[in-house]
Amino acid sequence: MKISVIMPMYNATKTVLYSVDSIVAQTYTDFEVLIVDDCSTDESVKICEEHYKDEPRVKVIRQEKNAGPAAARNRGMELAQGEYITFLDSDDGMLPDTLEKFADAAKKTDADVVHTVGKLIPGVNPTPDDIMSVPREKLMNNVADTDAPDTMTILPDDIGARIDGFLAGKYKGNVWGKMFKTNFLRDNALTFAHLKMSEDTIFSLECLLRAGTYVQIPESLIIYRMVGDSLSRGKKTPAFFAKILDATLGGNVVLQEKLSAIPYVKEHPENIKTILVRVAEAMEGVYIRPAYRIVGREAIESDDGINEVWSRYFGGNAFLMKKTFYDAHDSYPPVPDYFSEVEFGEMFEDKLKSQNKQEG
């Protein structure tokens, strides 16, 4: 059973070899790695082609134009030859037995989706380029799914129960740490929406609500870089705020369209609003409120790019929507920017100490 590992790449010279090497070093050997380059302007393509010239399982694919990680993942999905597909970012890593555990679960259950419940976060600051060099005792096991199972668990077929689980935080929206049956994706025409953010949440949710056999395994297998230069962890500027606002509003439109096409949701349309609110709240708490706090209302109100986003989605009602939004955010208590390096260290130091004490 071949597994296709798809890795979107853009200007990742510092980290990509370490990420790909973590795949090449897997105990499960029947895989291919599709590195899909999104028109990098650095030496990423060159170093990958040179480093893996004698490794036939690793292929570098060049996009014709820069179109973002969603388009890169979609291209990889089109070209994938494996029976299953999984994803890894070009600055993350995977434990050596990751694909073996994925394959074992898939073979036992014939799953459409295999879903791990957490991630491993390096408890060092700064995180080294070679994320695989972080000692095991410095990796914090972050079980993101609430009420995560202790053993391999097949979700009920009841889609309403799956929606309830999603709303309760049981199934997170990341695509790394999950593996998808290729025919399931193709038969349901499941692809990533062309959004700057939240496209992974929309994709994962659509898979959750369309899958036949959906399996959770109680593992944290992906080593995830919390602090980096990706869009979701970018510098808090008016331009960044415009991007996350556009992603949130645009994602809301796309998600509503995709939910409306799911048979169960068609029969129970009351779920649409509840899901939209849940996803918007997640974007709000993690991205929008921290950025609003740092950028400030004055800079946000006067920015042409941000005003254009409001006008594009709300037309003549943009002024009222902006005022309501800004007034509400002025009244909210401050929330931490979880992706700043200083707060990152403070946030995880005690948790890492507690974890190591329990394991010891």
Residue ranges of model-derived segments:
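Cell-envelope/extracellular polymer assembly enzymes that use nucleotide-activated donors
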Residues: 2-4, 22, 32, 202
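Donor-binding/catalytic cores of nucleotide-activated saccharide
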Residues: 69, 90-216, 222-241
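Catalytic core of nucleotide-sugar-dependent glycosyltransferases
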Residues: 219-228, 234-264, 285, 289-317
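Membrane-interface aromatic/basic loop that binds lipid-linked glycans or pyrophosphate carriers
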Residues: 132, 289-360
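Short aromatic/hydrophobic "clamp" motif used to bind/position activated sugar donors
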Residues: 85
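Glycine-rich, basic loop-to-helix element that forms the pyrophosphate-binding segment
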Residues: 63-80, 93, 101
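Short, well-formed alpha-helical segments that are part of the catalytic scaffolds
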Residues: 11-25
